[in-house]
Amino acid sequence: MHKFRLIGRIDINNENVVKGKCLEGLRKIGNPEEFASRYYKSGIDELVLMDAVASLYDRNSLIKILKETCKNVFIPITIGGGIRNLEDIQEALNAGADKVAINSQGLRDINFIKDAVRNYGSQAIIGSVVAREFRYSWEAFIDNAKHRSGVDAIDWAKILEDAGVGEIMVTSIDRDGRMKGFDSKLIKTVTESTKIPIIACGGAGSASDISSMINETNCDAVAISSILHYEHTSIEKLKDSLSKNGVQIRK
């Protein structure tokens, strides 16, 4: 049986860790290298470094931060935000990233994702679904949730799987930063519609939220931020609680 992964997500604007709610109202809360080092030392399984505004302003400023982070952090690191071409992927991997997450550019040109998988392998490419609920369905958003894509989020997840990505990170815009629980219905719909690993993101407020979501959705990992950034709990406490609830967790 595979072991469930706890992933620390660090959203970055320029050289600062930022966090808001529903991917809006971002405010500076710290230094990304310090956050990454602290989470690594505390036992996080993986990290995601996400440029919060890169796709809006046609830039990719994570490389310097990634290089500094990799000097002291020795777990898998994914970077995302502003990945537009194969050169961006190559630069990220050369700088120390293990994987890249792609959303906006993939929705604009699915052949980019296919080319990325063909060149670097599915294990290096994470498909990203950023979804907002509208009545009885979810729509995929681009540019850090600023613009609607017109594509159904579940369909987007299926397209990503067909394109060959190794796993999919599903972010609920409605739950992001609120720490009131995941959109389990969204995550469950994605897990039931695909056969590759799914990372749930958006809404973790407690170990109970994570345990409930695992039981309801059968996802493979969670990416968490606010609950750690604001020190509502620790990685050690989360892992201990999940283990006591029968979750096969990495120690």
Predicted region positions:
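Hydrophobic faces of well-ordered beta-strands that scaffold small-molecule active sites
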Residues: 6-10, 47-49, 77-81, 100-102, ...
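Conserved, mostly hydrophobic/aromatic
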Residues: 11, 39, 47, 79, ...
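Conserved anion-binding
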Residues: 12-14, 18-19, 97-170, 174-175
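Short, acidic/polar
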Residues: 28-40, 84-90, 149-159, 207-210
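Glycine-rich, proline-tolerant flexible connector loops at the mouths of alpha/beta enzymes
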Residues: 46-65, 104, 169-180
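Alpha-helix-loop-beta-strand connector modules within alpha/beta enzyme cores
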Residues: 58-78, 115-130, 180-205, 246-247
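Catalytic cores of alpha/beta
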Residues: 77-78, 83-99, 185-222
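C-terminal helical cap(s) of enzyme catalytic domains, especially alpha/beta-barrels
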Residues: 113-120, 214-224, 228-251
